[in-house]
């Protein structure tokens, strides 16, 4: 086949796939969870981001192998169904994935509200945060309902802008870093550092979006593997450097006090008030674009899960040629979560949800490894790493956060079991 024809039928090259992965990860996560990470790990925040990144890197290998074996726009949903069959277990995990995306949306909304409210007088910030976060999800849902194609086209531009600002933040801020603030004497306990890394694990969620584009990638055998590794490694380095500059530039107490807008506060020493404003605006732009991308993707996910007969058929019924019922349910749930739960509970739920899903994907790779001739023990190790990370996260979480997490997992399987009972779909299809 001539190269031009191949390129026409498979329009995404290596750097396009890398852009999908990096754009998915560097959404609003780093802006949302930096302050929380510093609060838990203190001077060890860079190490916490590194540990979370290594767990993501192990899982990226499984995604790479599964994407080549089962290229599909269904991505994670398809991998789990192909490995374990479309039964109650697969359905419950896939519903958990959808709920985890709703939690991610709530996190992005809280981050948007926090950074937007940072420009208000101190006594107006609490109410302002709720107003801004609610307005963000309502307006962006409206854009998706209207099918604003310009929003989709703007995504790449927004990704480029926020990456440029983060790189500028690192480049300018590195000169003012105090090594003493990063010394082991300033770290939390080892268990707290591990738990702190896992509570911000959801900042690495996003690389799996490459799987949804696998059908459109040129030379998938080579491109997918390289795209997964390049995107995750790049983001690990970026996050660690951002954490180094943040913790090395300001006392931990200052970052914790400004937890809702920590990255903007960390820009003050090197860039002054202009830096605070620049990072604040970049955070709002980034989290708004992340809300849009995640809202669109999660609505598509409900459509895919419904097509797999794991959610009601109404969710695969398009309205105006788009799966809007899933979109509206997702948006309504996000508004409720973002306004009711605190950042700690939301981060715990989101990170734990994705750790459970990623452990299952690693197990899916191990279960189907013989089909590819790959070494299953690596994926078993990756699944164990996810499980261990989950255990560390739960061990250091508050009772309230763990209760909400257990409720989310129970709700996932409860929704799936109820649907199967009502629809007459067997528990093991």
Model-inferred region functions:
Residues 2-9, 46, 50, 123-134, ...:
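Helix-loop-helix junctions that connect adjacent transmembrane segments
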Residues 30-34, 109-112, 143-149, 274-275, ...:
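Transmembrane helix-loop junctions in multi-pass membrane proteins
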Residues 1-35, 39-41, 57, 61, ...:
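Membrane-interface "cap" regions at the ends of multi-pass membrane proteins
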Residues 127-176, 187-190, 228-229, 351-360, ...:
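Membrane-interface loop-to-helix entry segments
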Residues 78-86, 118-122, 229-292, 310-343:
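TM-loop-TM module centered on a large, flexible mid-protein loop between adjacent transmembrane helices
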Residues 353, 366-429:
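A generic transmembrane alpha-helix motif of multi-pass inner-membrane proteins
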Residues 39, 48, 57-137, 141-145, ...:
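Hydrophobic transmembrane alpha-helices that form the core helical bundles
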Residues 40-43, 71-74, 82-89, 215-223, ...:
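Juxtamembrane helix-boundary/capping and inter-helix hinge elements in multi-pass membrane proteins
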């Amino acid at each position: 086949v001539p190269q031009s024809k191949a390129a026409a039928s498979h329009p995404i090259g290596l750097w396009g796939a890398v852009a999908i992965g990096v754009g998915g990860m560097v959404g609003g996560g780093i802006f949302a969870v930096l302050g929380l990470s510093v609060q838990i790990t203190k001077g060890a925040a860079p190490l916490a981001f590194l540990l979370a990144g290594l767990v993501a890197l192990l899982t990226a290998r499984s995604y790479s192998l599964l994407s080549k074996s089962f290229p599909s726009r269904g991505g994670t949903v398809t991998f789990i169904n192909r490995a374990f069959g479309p039964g109650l277990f697969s359905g419950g995990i896939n519903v958990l994935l959808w709920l985890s995306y709703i939690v991610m949306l709530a996190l992005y909304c809280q981050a948007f509200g926090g950074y937007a409210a940072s420009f208000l007088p101190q006594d107006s910030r609490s109410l302002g945060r709720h107003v801004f976060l609610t307005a963000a999800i309502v307006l962006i849902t409206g854009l998706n309902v209207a099918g604003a194609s310009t929003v989709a086209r703007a995504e790449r531009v927004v990704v480029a802008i926020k990456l440029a600002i983060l790189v500028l933040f690192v480049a300018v801020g590195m000169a003012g870093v105090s090594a003493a603030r990063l010394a082991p004497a300033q770290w939390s306990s080892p268990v707290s550092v591990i738990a702190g890394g896992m509570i911000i694990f959801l900042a690495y969620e996003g690389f799996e979006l490459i799987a949804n584009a696998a059908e459109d990638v040129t030379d998938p055998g080579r491109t997918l593997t390289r795209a997964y590794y390049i995107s995750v490694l790049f983001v690990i380095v970026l996050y660690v450097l951002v954490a180094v500059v943040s913790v090395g530039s300001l006392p931990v107490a200052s970052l914790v006090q400004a937890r809702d807008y920590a990255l903007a506060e960390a820009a003050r020493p090197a860039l002054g008030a202009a830096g605070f404003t620049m990072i604040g605006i970049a955070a709002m732009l980034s989290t708004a674009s992340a809300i849009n991308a995640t809202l669109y993707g999660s609505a598509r996910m409900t459509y895919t899960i419904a097509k797999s007969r794991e959610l009601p058929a109404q969710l695969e019924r398009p309205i105006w040629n788009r799966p809007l019922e899933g979109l509206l349910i997702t948006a309504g749930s996000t508004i409720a979560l973002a306004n009711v739960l605190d950042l700690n509970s939301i981060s715990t739920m989101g990170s734990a949800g994705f750790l459970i899903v990623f452990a299952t994907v690693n197990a899916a790779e191990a279960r189907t490894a013989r089909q590819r001739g790959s070494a299953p023990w690596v994926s078993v190790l990756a699944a164990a790493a996810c499980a261990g990370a989950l255990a560390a996260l739960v061990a250091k979480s508050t009772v309230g956060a763990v209760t909400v997490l257990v409720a989310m997992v129970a709700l996932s399987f409860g929704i799936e079991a109820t649907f199967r009972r009502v629809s007459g779909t067997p528990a093991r299809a």
